[in-house]
């Protein structure tokens, strides 16, 4: 902490008693040493000074930093908050610039720029407290002094560099294990061999695909030709109930997610309502708990019952209904259930699908109300009360936002017109045609038998013809079932070959791009290493927030995948994406490294906040004055796309950022935009082998 004696000395320097001394020394607070000359007298009268952008406005030199904004460009107040930031303009003179930011000299630590809005607010944002010298306020937060921060920085840098060395050694070990070649000639030869092999595989796959497509067209013609002899089955094929089942499964995936989102935030607030301490009289918390209890009572009266497990079971059952149960009725002319049950279930399924999706809107409204309550608590609760129940709820809510952030942006869900139309068509078809292909129920059959009197030889002949006709249809249908199986099998084979061919072609393209980048590049080295690791199907997985995330490298790289699975027996598994490309992102590297430092060191001190700076020529970007520590990471980014379809949204995709460490681990996963995930991973692949530490420029002058 800054000592009271030091503060006294700093403040007394600005008092009227030493004003003349300050003028002779001419050190202007808030201005770096190389720009101090801009505040020397620029008038014949050495007691005068004119505004840097307005030579016609002449002031007494004592008016600089006097707390009154006299210059239109704000140049007379570099060390106070008197001028509104928007009026400042950069002034070029003698190759230097003056702009709208306050310069912290920070003797003993690292100089930096801060915003004028942070000046004279009673809080020392500069470790030398120079931003509060002219405020006249009593300080209520002096923070760490520059000497303390220097010691903390040295410790932090030592830990980061030690971790980097371990990561670099682990990377070199991976290269030895998987046999990467540093020699450009060897790598070039290997690359050429891989390209030739990939080209040969593409040729073989293309030929196989052409043959299978021709076979598929032949089977398709035979199948639909035979279908034309069975009008009911032909009509059913046009409905495409399998596609409908997939669409409903996709819709119910979001229904389940909304239910889980409701359950989780309801639990956070329920636990908080039991664990918080009312006697602390935190008005924000007490008022919001009352709101929660009112909303909870309203939800109970409305009989809101969100259960993601039930939603998942219903989704699976509906998928089986449309892809297996209904097709069996018309293809095999059989059902395990009575005709009455078949028709009743068809109508029930339609009502369930329509009602469930609409019911989700009610749940979303309650989620939004609960989130407003937790937003207010998280942002405005009194941290000084140290209420363990509140702190636990706020932490849980932060994790909740990371997992369910997109729910706040969801519009009211409505079944699509195409889904409703398909659902209605299948329901009507079942109701109309199931009685034509299934035997009547037992009671109805008995009534028909009692009322049917076969009294003539003509009646007997007619019955015999009907039986023989059914036998012929059965024999024909048996052939149709066999043909349908062969047709579907060939259709699947063509789809698999198309995917395999695309992956091989993408791999060949990646090899071509790697050759263009140059065999000595870091990208080339890592691409080769990823390929070699993929040849042994290298996977890493971790459990986060009740989900198992798995990232697998394959050879070729385009076969690499990311999966998300529920952490339970028979948990639902979804494909997040397939490997698309790799590269390096400098901006993301800086952002992720800053996040890492905050998460690792912020709770222990205010060091990281004292490393954040505004660059004097670019106030729109956050910069950090920790030297080039961020460059110990190479900024490796892996992109994945074409995952499973999100309900009412795009296909899933992901960006994987890899930070340097000696061991692989998935540290966090969050949804940046709808169905697009950011994976923060640590491991040797994120280490920059060519990194050499360049420390920041400390102000250690005596």
Swiss-Prot record:
PROSITE patterns: MRH. The keyword Repeat does not apply. It holds the Pfam family PRKCSH-like. Residues 537-689 form the MRH domain. It is found in: Endoplasmic reticulum. One of its GO terms (cellular component) is glucosidase II complex. One of its GO terms (biological process) is polysaccharide biosynthetic process. It comes from the Eukaryota. Glycans are attached at residues 145, 240, 358, 520, 525, 688, 699. Residues 163-228, 478-517 form a coiled coil. Disulfide bonds join 539-552, 646-675, 660-687. Residues 1-20 form the signal peptide. Keywords: Coiled coil, Disulfide bond, Endoplasmic reticulum, Glycoprotein, Signal. InterPro entries: Gtb1-like (IPR039794), Man6P_isomerase_rcpt-bd_dom_sf (IPR009011), MRH_dom (IPR044865), PRKCSH (IPR036607), PRKCSH_N (IPR028146). Residues 435-457 are annotated as: Disordered. Subunit of glucosidase 2, which cleaves sequentially the 2 innermost alpha-1,3-linked glucose residues from the Glc(2)Man(9)GlcNAc(2) oligosaccharide precursor of immature glycoproteins. Specifically required for the cleavage of the final glucose. Heterodimer of a catalytic subunit alpha (ROT2) and a subunit beta (GTB1). Present with 9760 molecules/cell in log phase SD medium. This is Glucosidase 2 subunit beta. It comes from Saccharomyces cerevisiae (strain ATCC 204508 / S288c). The gene is GTB1.
């Amino acid at each position: 902490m800054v000592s009271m004696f030091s503060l006294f000395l700093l403040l007394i320097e600005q008092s009227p008693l030493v004003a003349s001394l300050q003028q002779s020394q001419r050190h202007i607070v808030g201005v770096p040493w190389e720009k101090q000359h801009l505040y020397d007298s620029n008038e014949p009268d050495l007691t005068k000074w004119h505004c840097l952008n307005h030579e016609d406005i002449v002031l007494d030199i004592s008016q600089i930093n006097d707390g009154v904004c006299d210059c239109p460009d704000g140049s007379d107040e570099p060390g106070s908050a008197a001028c509104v930031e928007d009026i400042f303009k950069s002034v070029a003179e003698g190759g230097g610039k003056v702009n709208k930011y306050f310069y912290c000299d920070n003797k003993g630590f690292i100089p930096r720029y801060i915003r004028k809005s942070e000046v004279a607010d009673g809080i020392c944002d500069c470790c030398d407290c120079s931003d509060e010298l002219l405020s006249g306020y009593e300080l209520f937060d002096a923070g760490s002094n520059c000497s303390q921060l220097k010691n903390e920085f040295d410790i932090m840098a030592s830990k980061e560099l030690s971790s980097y060395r371990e990561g670099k050694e682990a990377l070199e070990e991976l290269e030895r294990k998987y046999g990467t070649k540093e020699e450009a000639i060897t790598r070039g030869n290997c690359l050429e061999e891989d390209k030739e092999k990939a080209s040969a595989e593409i040729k073989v796959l293309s030929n196989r695909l052409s043959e299978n497509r021709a076979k598929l067209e032949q089977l398709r013609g035979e199948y639909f030709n035979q279908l034309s002899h069975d009008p009911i089955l032909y009509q059913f094929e046009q409905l495409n109930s399998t596609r409908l089942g997939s669409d409903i499964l996709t819709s119910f995936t979001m229904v389940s997610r909304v239910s889980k989102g409701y359950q989780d935030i309801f639990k956070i607030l329920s636990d908080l309502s039991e664990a918080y301490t009312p006697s602390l009289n935190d008005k924000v918390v007490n008022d919001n708990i009352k709101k929660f209890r009112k909303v909870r009572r309203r939800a109970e009266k409305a009989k809101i019952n969100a259960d993601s497990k039930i939603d998942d079971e219903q989704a699976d059952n509906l998928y089986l209904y449309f892809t297996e149960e209904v097709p069996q009725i018309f293809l095999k002319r059989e059902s395990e259930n009575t005709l009455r049950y078949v028709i009743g279930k068809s109508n029930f399924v339609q009502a369930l699908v329509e009602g469930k999706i609409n019911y989700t809107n009610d749940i979303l409204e309650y989620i939004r109300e609960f989130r407003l309550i937790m937003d207010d608590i998280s942002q405005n609760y009194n941290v000084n009360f140290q209420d363990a129940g509140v702190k636990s709820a706020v932490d849980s809510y932060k994790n909740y936002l990371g997992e369910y952030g997109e729910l706040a942006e969801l519009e009211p869900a409505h079944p699509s017109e195409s889904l409703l139309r398909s659902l209605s068509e299948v329901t009507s078809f079942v109701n109309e045609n199931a009685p034509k292909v299934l035997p009547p129920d037992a009671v109805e059959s008995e009534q028909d038998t009692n009322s049917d009197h076969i009294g003539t030889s003509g009646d007997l002949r007619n019955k015999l013809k009907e039986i023989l006709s059914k036998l012929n249809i059965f024999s024909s249908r048996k052939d149709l079932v066999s043909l349908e199986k062969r047709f579907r099998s060939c259709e699947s084979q063509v789809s698999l070959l198309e995917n395999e061919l695309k992956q091989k072609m993408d791999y060949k393209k990646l090899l071509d791009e790697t050759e263009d980048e140059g065999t000595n590049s870091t990208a080339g080295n890592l691409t080769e290493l990823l390929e070699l690791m993929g040849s042994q199907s290298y996977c890493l997985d971790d459990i986060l927030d009740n989900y198992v995330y798995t990232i697998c490298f394959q050879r070729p790289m385009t076969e690499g995948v990311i999966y998300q699975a529920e952490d339970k027996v028979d948990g639902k598994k979804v494909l997040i994406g397939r490997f698309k490309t790799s590269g390096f992102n400098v901006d993301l590297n800086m952002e992720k490294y800053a996040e890492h430092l905050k998460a690792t060191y912020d709770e222990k001190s205010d060091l990281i906040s004292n490393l954040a700076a505004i660059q004097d020529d670019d106030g729109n970007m956050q910069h950090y004055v920790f030297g080039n520590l961020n460059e110990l990471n190479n900024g490796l980014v892996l992109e994945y796309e074409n995952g499973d379809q999100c309900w009412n949204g795009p296909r899933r995709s992901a960006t994987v950022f890899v930070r340097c460490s000696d061991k692989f681990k998935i540290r966090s996963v969050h949804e940046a935009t709808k169905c697009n995930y950011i994976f923060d991973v640590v491991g040797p692949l994120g280490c920059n082998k060519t990194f050499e530490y360049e420390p920041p420029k400390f102000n250690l002058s005596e």
